[in-house]
């Protein structure tokens, strides 16, 4: 029995030696520990069997020298690397959910700190007007382009970069004069971009320091993220309600309850939608030709209103006010340095805009309710349809009243124009007349054959071609102009309606699909009023 135990110990020690060479000693020891207990005995023999692998290692190494040579040439480290690398990759690919939640909680707590929150704003929040300025080439890249125009690569060695920096000189940084100079340069660039957006720069040589792409101004109704200062310091989402180009600000109504409406500078407003840009070269081509510079202004002629607006006459507060007798005085009366009739029109304009804003709010709520019913596959009730139709009709009447009041306000503004040094301007109808004359000249030149006979002899067709050509010339003049207003669009709409009325009923659908819809898109693109160009012209003519 003792001899059998000795043979088992020697065989196990030999296996342990081979497994040690192959890097799997732990597996061999596990196999040895899993032997049946019936083969082990108590006392000294079991202790000897545990010590035999260390005693017999030298003898087994000498006896098995031929088998050990190929084993010694193998590298156990390499085999371990190959086997463990996939396990590490699988662990990285599937992170622990608890660890991720813990990191997210710590990050959220960090961003609650005022300094960390401001640091994130300064680092990543760029407004539409600042994004091309800060995300473009930095000062070092600009200096490289000016100092080394022939340098086409940016992959240089450290020695070559050191030589370039030595030639350029040491920059002056982190001084009060440097920061003041940078702030002034940024302020000037912002002002140049605003003037470009308003088409008020004629000399494009002043815009050499601006980026190649200039962002377009935001329009009313755009979803934005704006920064508030003061009590509510931070970034909040909202919607643009008004645009003030003179002060370079936006009137933003915020989504969060309690914030209300605030005036925010344009350099602290970021659009949530992808911002549109225009090449700076396109602004140079948008300058108005001298022959059209006096055409695109509202008329100075007197406006004969048919009826007075019911918004002021039937107002119980205004009818009982002691100021009513003063506000209905003669033409020469003034109040606070302004004509009385002008103040009346401004008050009417303010009330119409306030009422229209409430109607648009109700219309938005009804749209939300209708979309909710549609998502639930529920029918839209008759009461909702009636309220919706009533609101739409009220908005149409408000647009008509608003157009009349705008005519009156524009009339008073241009009566005050000579005192402010403004030059008198022609009516938009003059622009329309000039375009019609030019279209007739173009048609006369291109409709004549070499023999002197006309190409198109039908009079109705020649008139239609002339009117459509005049419409295109009118659109070109509006596109090349500067600031646009409702009177210019009204003249364009009047020309379109005249052409539409002269067409046969069988061709109206073709005219609407191929001409009218494209002109409407052009009007929407030219106007900076966005979706509010509905009341810029009288679009109530329907067939």
From Swiss-Prot:
Entry's Gene Ontology molecular function annotations: DNA binding
Report the protein name in the record: Protein lin-9 homolog
Keywords tagged on the record: Coiled coil, Nucleus
The similarity annotation says: Belongs to the lin-9 family.
Region annotated Disordered sits at 21-82
Q: Where is the composition biased (Polar residues)?
A: 24-55
Q: Would the keyword Ion transport turn up in this protein's UniProt record?
A: no
Quaternary structure per UniProt? Answer: Component of the DREAM complex.
One biological process term from GO is: regulation of cell cycle
Q: Where in the cell is it found?
A: Nucleus
Task: Quote the cellular component terms of the Gene Ontology held in the record.
Answer: nucleoplasm; transcription repressor complex
Coiled-coil regions listed: 355-451
Disulphide bonds annotated for this chain are none
Q: Which Pfam families would you find in this protein's record?
A: DIRP, LIN9_C
């Amino acid at each position: 029995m003792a001899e059998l135990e000795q043979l088992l110990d020697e065989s196990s020690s030999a296996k342990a030696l081979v497994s040690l060479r192959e890097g799997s000693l732990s597996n061999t020891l596990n196999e040895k520990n899993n032997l049946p207990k019936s083969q082990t005995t108590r006392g000294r023999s079991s202790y000897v069997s545990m010590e035999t692998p260390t005693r017999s290692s030298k003898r087994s190494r000498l006896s098995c020298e031929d088998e050990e040579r190929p084993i010694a040439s193998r590298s156990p480290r390499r085999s371990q690397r190959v086997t463990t690398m996939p396990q590490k990759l699988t662990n990285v690919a599937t992170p622990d959910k608890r660890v991720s939640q813990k990191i997210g909680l710590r990050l959220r707590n960090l961003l609650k700190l005022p300094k960390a929150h401001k640091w994130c704003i300064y680092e990543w929040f760029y407004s539409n007007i600042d994004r091309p300025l800060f995300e473009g080439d930095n000062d070092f890249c600009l200096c490289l382009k000016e100092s080394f125009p022939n340098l086409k690569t940016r992959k240089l060695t450290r020695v070559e970069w050191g030589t370039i920096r030595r030639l350029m000189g040491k920059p002056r940084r982190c001084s009060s004069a440097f920061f003041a100079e940078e702030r002034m340069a940024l302020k000037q660039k912002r002002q140049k971009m605003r003037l470009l957006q308003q088409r008020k720069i004629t000399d494009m040589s002043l815009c050499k320091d601006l980026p190649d792409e200039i962002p377009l101004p935001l329009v009313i109704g755009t979803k934005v993220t704006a920064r508030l200062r003061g009590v509510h310091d931070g970034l909040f989402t909202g919607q643009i309600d008004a645009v003030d180009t003179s002060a370079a600000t936006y009137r933003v109504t915020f989504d969060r309850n309690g914030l209300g409406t605030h005036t925010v500078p344009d350099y602290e407003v970021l659009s949530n939608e992808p911002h549109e840009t225009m090449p700076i070269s396109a602004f140079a081509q948008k300058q108005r030709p001298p022959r059209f510079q006096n055409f695109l202004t509202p008329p100075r002629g007197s406006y004969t209103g048919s009826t007075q607006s019911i918004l002021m006459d039937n107002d119980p507060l205004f009818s009982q006010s002691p100021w009513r007798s003063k506000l209905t005085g003669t033409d020469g009366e003034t109040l606070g340095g302004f004509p009385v009739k002008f103040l009346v029109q401004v008050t009417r304009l303010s009330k119409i805009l306030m009422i229209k804003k409430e109607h648009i709010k109700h219309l938005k709520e009804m749209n939300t309710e209708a979309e909710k019913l549609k998502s639930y596959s529920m029918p839209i009730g008759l009461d909702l349809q009636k309220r919706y139709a009533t609101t739409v009709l009220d908005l149409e009447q408000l647009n008509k009243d608003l157009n009349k009041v705008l005519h009156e306000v524009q009339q008073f503004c241009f009566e005050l124009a000579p005192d402010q040094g403004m030059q008198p301007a022609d009516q938009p109808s003059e622009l329309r007349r000039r375009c019609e004359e030019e279209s007739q000249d173009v048609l006369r030149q291109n409709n004549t054959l070499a023999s002197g006979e006309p190409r198109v002899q039908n009079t109705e067709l020649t008139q239609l071609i002339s009117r459509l050509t005049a419409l295109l010339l009118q659109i070109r003049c509006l596109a090349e102009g500067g600031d646009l207003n409702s009177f210019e669009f009204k003249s364009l709409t009047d020309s379109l309606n005249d052409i539409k009325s002269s067409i046969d009923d069988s061709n109206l659908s073709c005219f609407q699909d191929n001409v009218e819809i494209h002109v409407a898109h052009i009007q929407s693109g030219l106007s900076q009023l966005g979706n509010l160009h509905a009341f810029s012209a009288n679009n109530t003519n329907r067939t």
